[in-house]
Amino acid sequence: MSEFEHLRHKPPAILDRPREIVIACAPMKSNINLSRIVRVAGCCAITRVIACGNAQLDKKIARDGADTVQIEVRRTLPPVLKELKADGYRLVGLEQTTGSANLHEYQFERRTALVIGNERTGLTEDLLVLLDATVEIPVWGLPYSYNVASATTMAIYEYCKQFSRG
């Protein structure tokens, strides 16, 4: 008998307080990417995702995240980002820029809006000018960037690691 027993689903960890991170997504080409982001948000007890454009979830991919995450669909991101900033959120873009901080060295503020760009164009200039900071994930091989859902997952995980109790 192995010392490890497979557990299909462990109960979720209990947080001391709700997470204060919002995921704000530019219009995406693929509903699969948005659905993957919502699934990860649900797993990490993030309750709010803002999606722009013709966003639709694939519930088979988003799974329980489709039921536990509040998804707001907006036409464009700039007005949303201005609202979040007025509500005290620090606007952090996930993008490779000349001033990007390394994700592994960046200290998130508890009240963060993580701004995610389009799969092809990333964060456009009208969004970049509104941000307080940008973070990027080191790439050690090719291609030169990660899939948007994979990169968002890594950034969410880093935030949750820094605020492990909520």
Predicted segments, located by residue:
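Post-transcriptional modification and biogenesis factors for structured RNAs
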Residues: 1-166
